[in-house]
């Protein structure tokens, strides 16, 4: 997330005589501290507190509640883990560099770690969002197939591939980064000038950024958009069909509410990550920097940084706002002994019609219009039918 260079983008062939090393270093690298350090740091601190607490709660409720251990929620768990990595490991480095643009004190290993971390979580996040969208598409459009194939064991295998691919594809950008020193005209290194930046030819960096932005943002978001469009058509078609009292029905309210929540998650994800990729692509396509271009880039860079970290904090808020089941799980984890923190049981309504959840193992997830369910509650009312556990699942 850090800038590759600062004032050195703009080549000054008539470098004037400077009286001190500090002035010379400031001429080469720009100011040591960003003008927006204080307000951005305050924003980052708020995002850090909300994001860490929220994502820890997400992980806890999924781990502790058996009813939430579904394939879709495993992907959301992966997304929460990547958000925690960014907030706990990436944000402190970002704040430090905001107040001390140079020197970089953590050496080559710290530089490699920083670059690999941001690249890995960037790729893992978009791949997790893509996989959960594909799972939702299969559950909506091909429910029988989802019942047979969408298992927790399969989700774990896919997540292993997601993180493995993310680490592998982070290596190209990581390998071209390193510690770079500024030099005096006589060739000696300027003290305190170490920065973590690109050390290979810039065309290599530009090519990597353009390729990864296409493979890990433009292409996945296009696929996700198509999938949610098809899901919307299917849900709209189902709503237009007249209810058949004899036919077996799918629990459409739950299916629709889960899809709505995931759609909002994807939409917010796209909004938050678009500035990040605009920032990277902007830098990669500019060949000759001017003061106006540098000013525009610096503005985009600050905005992209705030939105990048904001994306790591908003997901738990989305779950809490749009998922009754998740709100109940939150309350159960935060204050399990507080009787006022849990919703009262609703009065028993009229008998419900017989409903079979054709994709029960997949669709009973974070959201449920019928209210929160925990172990001991039943999803089928007034019916003698029983449901068998999904293949590969624990009852």
UniProtKB/Swiss-Prot annotation:
It is a multi-pass membrane protein. Residues 375-387 have a biased composition (Polar residues). The keyword ATP-binding does not apply. Belongs to the G-protein coupled receptor 1 family. Disulfide bonds join 111-196. SUPFAM superfamilies: Family A G protein-coupled receptor-like. The keyword Chaperone does not apply. This is Neuromedin-U receptor 2. Residues 374-395 are annotated as: Disordered. Keywords: Cell membrane, Disulfide bond, G-protein coupled receptor, Glycoprotein, Membrane, Receptor, Transducer, Transmembrane, Transmembrane helix. It comes from Rattus norvegicus. The highest level is detected in the uterus. In the central nervous system, high expression levels were found in the hypothalamus and moderate levels in both the medulla oblongata and spinal cord. Expressed in the hypothalamic paraventricular nucleus (PVN) and suprachiasmatic nuclei (SCN) of the hypothalamus. Expression is low in the gastrointestinal tract. In other peripheral tissues, moderate expression was observed in the lung and ovary. InterPro entries: GPCR_Rhodpsn, GPCR_Rhodpsn_7TM, NeuromedU_rcpt, NeuromedU_rcpt_2, NMU-R2_C.
């Amino acid at each position: 997330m850090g800038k590759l260079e600062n004032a050195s983008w703009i080549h000054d062939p008539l470098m004037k005589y400077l009286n001190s090393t500090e002035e010379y270093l400031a001429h080469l690298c720009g100011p040591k501290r960003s003008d927006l350090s204080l307000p951005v740091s305050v924003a980052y601190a708020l995002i850090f507190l909300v994001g860490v607490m929220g994502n820890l709660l997400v992980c806890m409720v999924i781990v502790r509640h058996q009813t939430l251990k579904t394939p879709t929620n495993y992907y959301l768990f992966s997304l929460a883990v990547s958000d925690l990595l960014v907030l706990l490991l990436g944000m402190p480095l970002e704040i430090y560099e905001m107040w001390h643009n140079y020197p970089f004190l953590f050496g080559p290993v710290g530089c490699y770690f920083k670059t690999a971390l941001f690249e890995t979580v960037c790729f893992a996040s978009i791949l997790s969002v893509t996989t959960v969208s594909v799972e939702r598409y299969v559950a909506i459009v091909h429910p029988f197939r989802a019942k047979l194939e969408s298992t927790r064991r399969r989700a774990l295998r896919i997540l292993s591939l997601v993180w493995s691919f993310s680490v592998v594809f982070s290596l190209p950008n990581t390998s071209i980064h390193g510690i770079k020193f500024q030099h005096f005209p006589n060739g000696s290194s300027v003290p305190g000038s170490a920065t973590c930046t690109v050390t290979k030819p810039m065309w290599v960096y530009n090519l990597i950024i353009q390729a990864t932005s296409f493979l890990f943002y433009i292409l996945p978001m296009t696929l996700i958009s198509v999938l949610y469009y098809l899901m919307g058509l299917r849900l709209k078609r189902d709503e237009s069909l007249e209810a058949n009292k004899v036919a077996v029905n799918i629990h459409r309210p739950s299916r629709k509410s889960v899809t709505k929540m995931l759609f909002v998650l994807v939409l917010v994800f796209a909004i938050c990550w678009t500035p990040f990729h605009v920032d990277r692509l902007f830098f990669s396509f500019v060949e000759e920097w001017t003061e106006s271009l540098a000013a525009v880039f610096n503005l985009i860079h600050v905005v992209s940084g705030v939105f990048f970290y904001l994306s790591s904090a908003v997901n738990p808020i989305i779950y809490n706002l749009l998922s009754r089941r998740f709100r109940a799980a939150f309350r159960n984890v935060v204050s399990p002994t507080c009787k006022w923190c849990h919703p009262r049981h609703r009065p028993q309504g009229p008998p419900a019609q017989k409903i079979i959840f054709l994709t029960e193992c997949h669709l009973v997830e974070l959201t449920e219009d019928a209210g929160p369910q925990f172990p001991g509650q039943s999803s089928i009312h007034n019916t003698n039918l029983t449901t068998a556990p999904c293949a590969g699942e624990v009852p």
